[in-house]
């Protein structure tokens, strides 16, 4: 590579080189786009230049944990990440390597440390409901955040770190926690244009988080515009999970 000064990219998909060695090559040539394939869980696989990862179906892709998800840190171009519903996932350190991350579904996992999220300054949408995270201070600098779900974190008792997020549009806190009502009102005052929900209980995505109405004649729910966009961003309607067999380049 040193003999090719005009080199722009290198594709080493499925070449058998370890992640560590590939990362060393990428670090040695920061002006070259170095791409390879990583595997995580039991059946998830993506190239390191992907912008979307959908890995929230452990029954088919395998349950993610801190060990078999570590390779996600090499996917530095990710904008849309869904690793929800992974009960064994107790560490999300890999998101610290995703500076372009805009949407993150980290809900119904077992992690408690949100520190890695502080590096994701482009985050616009974050679901972290039903986790063990009670320290929200790493979120205080995420000024681009507009939609945040922290409902059903039963030991949560302090949302004051969110007061700085004055441009929030929706904040789901729910009622199944220890957050004082005074803090709820302070949050509403800090972000006057934000819809703050402190009533949902056993369904953290209830209220207007996903659906805004129900059409009795057509028997269909009317999607919230942001949820409709979310479904498009992740390919939920086509079940476009990051299984290796769904990757046309594999």
What are these regions (language model features)?
Residues 1-23, 27-138, 144-185, 189-250:
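Concave beta-strand-loop units of leucine-rich repeat
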């Amino acid at each position: 590579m040193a003999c090719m000064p005009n080199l722009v990219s290198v594709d080493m998909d499925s070449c058998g080189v370890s992640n560590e060695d590939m990362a060393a090559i990428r670090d040695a040539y920061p002006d070259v786009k170095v791409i390879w394939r990583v595997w995580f869980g039991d059946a998830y696989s993506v190239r390191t230049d992907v912008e979307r990862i959908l890995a929230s179906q452990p029954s088919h892709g395998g349950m993610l944990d801190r060990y078999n998800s570590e390779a996600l840190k090499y996917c530095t171009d990710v904008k849309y990440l869904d690793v929800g519903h992974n009960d064994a996932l107790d560490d999300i350190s890999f998101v610290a390597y995703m500076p372009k991350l805009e949407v993150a579904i980290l809900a119904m996992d077992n992690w408690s440390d949100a520190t890695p999220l502080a590096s994701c300054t482009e985050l616009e949408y974050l679901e972290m409901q039903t986790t063990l995270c009670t320290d929200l201070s790493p979120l205080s600098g995420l000024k681009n955040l507009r939609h945040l779900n922290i409902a059903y974190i039963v030991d949560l008792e302090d949302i004051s770190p969110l007061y700085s997020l004055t441009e929030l549009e929706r904040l789901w806190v729910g009622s199944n926690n220890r957050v004082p009502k005074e803090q709820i009102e302070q949050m509403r005052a800090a972000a006057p244009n934000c819809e703050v929900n402190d009533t949902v209980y056993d369904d953290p995505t209830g209220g207007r988080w996903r659906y805004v109405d129900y059409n009795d004649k057509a028997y269909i729910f009317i999607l919230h515009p942001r949820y409709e966009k979310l479904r498009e961003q992740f390919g939920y309607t086509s079940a476009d999970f990051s299984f290796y067999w769904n990757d046309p380049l594999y």
